[in-house]
């Protein structure tokens, strides 16, 4: 974890601008993810002639690479400092675009072209994990650990913004210049971000002795489990709300997803100091309660307006879960291990979103679409119970106490 630079307290607009000036590098990394997201599946299936399996695999490779590389990103950020990790990650984003460019050049040889696309996706996954983890820690190093919740919140906001912008922009780039035009756009975004990052002052890495990975995992896994359980609600909304609306014979699934995103971002903007004022565990429990109500409304909805209110509440509830639990998880380890703690904690969300889709699909096939929202509400209720138990544990039994001993 970087050591924050000693300077006067930051407040309000100045604080937010300071944070945004760093998390914009995470925005750039997610923009390089969003740009090809709506293009590559169709390109692999229609233009290259491969099956839907290969089209899906090309997209999934990035997520697997992110999942496997994230703990290493946190560890290296603790040792080398977050700025170097961000630049390294952005270089990976640049190389992913170069991989797409080579795939376009090799389009006469479909297997080679597919291999180059897959390589680009793997490099992108590694780059995103490093740029995302590093930008959070860099932001904390700039504004101080008191504002870690706000830094994490802003990272989520720019992530959603980049993905929302990237997909339609990528379609336009592909329509304009084919895969080559898309690749050059990805490379241009990453290169611009690298050039903006290099002159920025770095923050010092903490020189303390790092804990082994197993020790870090032991101190954050309960918070990660609560996050994983709560992420199921987000997963079933994002993946299956369209099928839910189709099963009901309703229109407006896209608007429901828009409501979720607006609620997610709006809640983070409206309550930037909620975690500092109430505490991470308290905020998480409130959020779980709101998310449960939202999922129950969706699962039992008899009218479209009920489902839309449910989706809105689910977005509001899930919005602050990650930063609220993340603040507590990061403080459960010494400063020199907080990068590893943040990365390890994030892995639980990655894994949850990875398994929610197929498991919910099996449940949906067996019991119908609405049941998955009721099941997700049950999982979030388990997260609420787990967090309540964590709050009730005596201080001597909490990971934070152990980390300071």
Swiss-Prot record:
GO terms for molecular function: transmembrane transporter activity. The keyword Cell membrane applies. GO terms for cellular component: plasma membrane. PANTHER family: MAJOR FACILITATOR SUPERFAMILY MFS_1, RESISTANCE PROTEIN MDTM, PUTATIVE-RELATED-RELATED. InterPro entries: MFS, MFS_dom, MFS_trans_sf, MFS_Transporters, MFS_YhhS-like. The chain crosses the membrane at residues 19-39, 48-68, 85-105, 106-126, 129-149, 156-176, 178-198, 224-244, 252-272, 283-303, 309-329, 344-364, 366-386. It is a multi-pass membrane protein. CDD domains: MFS_YfcJ_like. SUPFAM superfamilies: MFS general substrate transporter. Belongs to the major facilitator superfamily. YhhS family. This is Uncharacterized MFS-type transporter YhhS. It is found in: Cell inner membrane. Keywords: Cell inner membrane, Cell membrane, Membrane, Transmembrane, Transmembrane helix, Transport.
């Amino acid at each position: 974890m970087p050591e924050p630079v000693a300077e006067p307290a930051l407040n309000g607009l100045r604080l937010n601008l300071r944070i945004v000036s760093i998390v914009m590098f995470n925005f750039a990394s997610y923009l390089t993810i969003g740009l090809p997201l709506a293009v590559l599946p169709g390109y692999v299936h229609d233009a290259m002639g491969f099956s839907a399996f290969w089209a899906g695999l090309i997209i999934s490779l990035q997520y697997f690479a992110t999942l496997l590389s994230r703990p290493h990103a946190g560890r290296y950020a603790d040792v080398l400092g977050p700025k170097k990790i961000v630049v390294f990650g952005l270089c990976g984003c640049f190389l992913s675009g170069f991989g797409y460019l080579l795939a376009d050049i090799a389009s006469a040889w479909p297997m080679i072209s597919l291999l180059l696309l897959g390589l680009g996706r793997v490099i992108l996954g590694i780059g995103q994990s490093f740029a995302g983890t590093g930008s959070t820690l860099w932001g904390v190093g700039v504004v101080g650990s008191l504002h870690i919740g706000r830094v994490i919140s802003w990272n989520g906001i720019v992530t959603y913004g980049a993905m929302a912008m990237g997909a339609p922009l990528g379609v336009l780039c592909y329509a304009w210049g084919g895969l080559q035009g898309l690749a050059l756009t990805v490379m241009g975004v990453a290169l611009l971000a690298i050039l903006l990052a290099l002159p920025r002052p770095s923050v010092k890495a903490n020189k303390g002795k790092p804990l082994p990975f197993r020790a870090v995992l032991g101190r954050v896994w309960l918070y990660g489990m609560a996050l994983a359980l709560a992420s199921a609600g987000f997963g079933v909304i994002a993946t299956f709300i369209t099928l839910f609306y189709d099963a009901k014979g309703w229109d407006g699934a896209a608007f429901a997803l828009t409501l979720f995103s607006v609620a997610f971002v709006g809640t983070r903007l409206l309550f930037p100091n909620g975690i500092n004022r109430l505490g991470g565990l308290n905020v998480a429990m409130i959020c779980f309660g709101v998310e449960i109500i939202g999922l129950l409304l969706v699962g039992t909805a008899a009218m479209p307006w009920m489902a839309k209110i449910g989706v809105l509440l689910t977005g509001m509830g899930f919005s602050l879960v990650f930063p609220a639990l993340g603040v507590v998880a990061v403080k459960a380890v010494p400063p020199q291990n907080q990068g590893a703690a943040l990365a390890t904690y994030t892995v639980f969300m990655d894994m949850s979103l990875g398994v929610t889709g197929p498991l919910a699909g099996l449940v949906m096939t067996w019991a119908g679409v609405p049941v998955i929202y009721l099941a997700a509400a049950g999982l979030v209720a388990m997260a609420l119970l787990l967090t309540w138990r964590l709050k009730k544990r005596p201080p001597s039994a909490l990971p934070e106490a152990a980390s300071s001993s």
